[in-house]
Design a protein with these regions (language model features):
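Loop/turn elements at helix/coil->beta-strand transitions in domains of secreted/extracellular proteins
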Residues: 52-54, 82-87, 114-118, 136
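Thiol-/selenol-based redox modules, centered on thioredoxin-like
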Residues: 141-202
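Short active-site neighborhood of thiol/selenol oxidoreductases, capturing the structured segment around
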Residues: 45-68, 176
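Bacterial Sec-dependent N-terminal signal peptides
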Residues: 1-23
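Short, thiol/selenol-centered motifs that function as redox-active sites or metal-ligating centers
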Residues: 61-70, 139, 195-198, 202
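Short, internal strand/loop/helix patches
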Residues: 107-151
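N-terminal "domain-start" segment that seeds a small globular fold
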Residues: 19-47
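Structural microenvironment flanking redox-active thiols in thiol-disulfide oxidoreductases
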Residues: 68-112, 123-129
Length: 202
């Protein structure tokens, strides 16, 4: 009985999280830039990366078990694609609703896990809402054209959220590799598996 209630609670949480984000990007949409505070105290925007051909934007956090399970894979993605598709992590969790996700906690977490990429705080949650992010982690791969940034992939990192050794489909890597090669992305959208973003008005 307790297991059934727990599963029902998780389902309700996901439903509520999704209902709080009524808009958001779809594949093919134009993504707008943002300027958010990084863990080093500086403001970061996509425009800062003049040589980037695109971006791997990941809405993430410190506390979700799925985010923790993906941590090593996220660091690896950054190392693999930093030259032309830099990774940008964004924490949109309300620190009032999610203990352990304050800005100070982010600084400590990034240092502990040797982050070599920006880890930005979306204090107003406006960027998460604009993108339509619902879970952590939730990935948006952006492709830079001559005039703007196009959303090329939305979803999960791979097909094994809890166990890196069981991965058979690497959706983000496949998407970026396709963009690099000028080829269509085979799977441009998947379901983001993770914890619901903790909204201020939840």
């Amino acid at each position: 009985m307790k297991i059934v209630n727990f599963v029902s609670l998780i389902g309700l949480t996901i439903l509520i999280a999704g209902s709080l984000v009524k808009n958001g990007y779809e594949v093919g949409d134009t993504a707008t830039d943002f300027k958010l505070k990084n863990i080093d105290g500086k403001l970061v925007s996509l425009a800062d990366f003049k040589e980037a051909k695109g971006f791997i934007v990941i809405f993430d956090c410190n506390t979700c078990p799925y985010s923790k399970a993906y941590n090593g894979r996220i660091v690896a993605l950054s190392k693999k694609y930093s030259k032309d598709f830099p990774l940008i992590a964004i924490n949109a969790n309300s620190n009032e609703e999610s203990q352990g996700d304050s800005y100070e906690d982010m600084v400590k977490y990034a240092k502990k896990h040797n982050y070599d990429f920006p880890y930005l705080v979306d204090a107003t949650q406006e960027i998460a809402r604009a993108y339509g992010a619902t879970n952590t982690p939730h990935v948006f791969v952006l492709n830079r054209t001559h005039t703007d940034l196009k959303v090329a992939y939305i979803g999960t990192i791979d097909d094994s959220p809890r166990n890196a050794s069981s991965v058979t489909k690497r959706y983000v890597e496949d998407a970026v590799d396709a963009l690099r090669a000028g080829k269509p992305i085979t799977t441009p959208k998947t379901k983001a598996i993770g914890c619901g973003i903790r909204w201020k008005d939840a």
